[in-house]
């Protein structure tokens, strides 16, 4: 017959705790898999982002004007607020890096337009439908700006124009007295270039001489349209 061995309770409990401690110590941890892993020190800090990236989360920087003379008024228009605010922020940052003192954006009164049109044809022609469109505006003013720098700023904004945003700019250039006399003293070659451009504005082309008018009247199509048998003349 087999005898049952009676073990003391204290010895059994101490053995179980020792096995539990041994099992926990033998478990592998993720940090133990990397050999010679350097321990991070408390003094080390995470690398910071570049200044240009940090500046995106801050308000755009602005330069102070010395005299406060307006050089350009840029008006931005859009039907949505988000693209308008985004492009206004972009325009202010571009003006700062070009050395232009910019002020704004100043909210302007919104433009509200409404239309009433027939809803549909046939049986719905007596019912009407209303449409409404709201235009949001912002104003950015450049003061004490060089005209060439202002034109460069506007060209940069046109190149990188955001969709859904319209622009309207008014510029002022200040020159010395007697600028008209300088224009009169231009060389003949430059005057010819200016006259060539002005010739495309308005009705400056002459009708023609009397011989040209008589030639037009003697055309066959003109006589058939007027029902003339004898060609007309310009003689009195």
From Swiss-Prot:
Superkingdom of this entry's organism? Eukaryota
Pfam families named in the record: Ribosomal_S10
Q: Which SUPFAM superfamilies match?
A: Ribosomal protein S10
Q: Which GO terms describe its molecular function?
A: structural constituent of ribosome
The transit peptide region is found at 1-24
Q: State the GO CC annotations.
A: mitochondrion; ribonucleoprotein complex; ribosome
Annotated spans, Disordered: 29-49
Quote the biased-composition stretches of kind Basic and acidic residues, using this chain's numbering: 39-49
Keyword vocabulary terms for this entry: Mitochondrion, Ribonucleoprotein, Ribosomal protein, Transit peptide
Q: Which SMART domains match?
A: Ribosomal_S10 (SM01403)
**Any one biological process term the GO annotation gives:** translation
Among InterPro entries, the record links this protein to: Ribosomal_uS10, Ribosomal_uS10_dom, Ribosomal_uS10_dom_sf
Q: Where is the protein found, in the record's own terms? A: Mitochondrion
Q: How does it assemble?
A: Part of the mitochondrial small ribosomal subunit.
List, alphabetically, the PANTHER family matched: 30S RIBOSOMAL PROTEIN S10 FAMILY MEMBER
Name the job this protein performs: Involved in mitochondrial genome encoded proteins translation. Involved in the binding of tRNA to the ribosomes.
- Any idea what this protein is called? Small ribosomal subunit protein uS10m
Q: Which organism is it from?
A: Gibberella zeae (strain ATCC MYA-4620 / CBS 123657 / FGSC 9075 / NRRL 31084 / PH-1) (Wheat head blight fungus)
């Amino acid at each position: 017959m087999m005898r049952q061995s009676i073990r003391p309770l204290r010895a059994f409990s101490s053995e179980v705790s020792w096995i539990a401690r041994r099992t926990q110590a033998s478990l592998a941890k993720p940090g133990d898999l990397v050999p010679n892993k350097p321990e991070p020190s408390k003094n080390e800090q995470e690398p910071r982002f570049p200044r240009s990236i940090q500046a995106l989360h801050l308000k755009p920087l602005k330069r102070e004007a010395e005299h406060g003379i307006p050089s350009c008024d840029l008006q931005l228009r859009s039907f949505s607020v988000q693209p308008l605010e985004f492009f206004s922020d972009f325009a202010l940052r571009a003006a700062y890096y070009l050395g232009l003192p910019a002020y704004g954006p100043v909210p302007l009164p919104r433009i509200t337009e409404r239309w009433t049109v027939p809803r549909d044809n046939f049986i719905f022609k007596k019912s009407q439908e209303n449409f409404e469109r709201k235009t949001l505006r912002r104003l950015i003013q450049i003061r004490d700006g060089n005209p060439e720098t202002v034109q460069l700023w506007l060209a940069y904004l046109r190149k990188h124009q955001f969709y859904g945003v319209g622009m309207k700019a008014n510029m002022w250039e200040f020159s010395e007295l007697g600028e008209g006399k300088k224009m009169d003293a231009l060389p003949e070659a430059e005057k010819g270039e200016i006259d060539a451009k002005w010739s495309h504005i308005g009705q400056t082309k002459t009708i023609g001489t009397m011989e040209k008018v008589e030639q037009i009247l003697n055309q066959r199509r003109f006589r058939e349209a007027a029902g003339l048998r004898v060609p007309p003349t310009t003689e009195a």
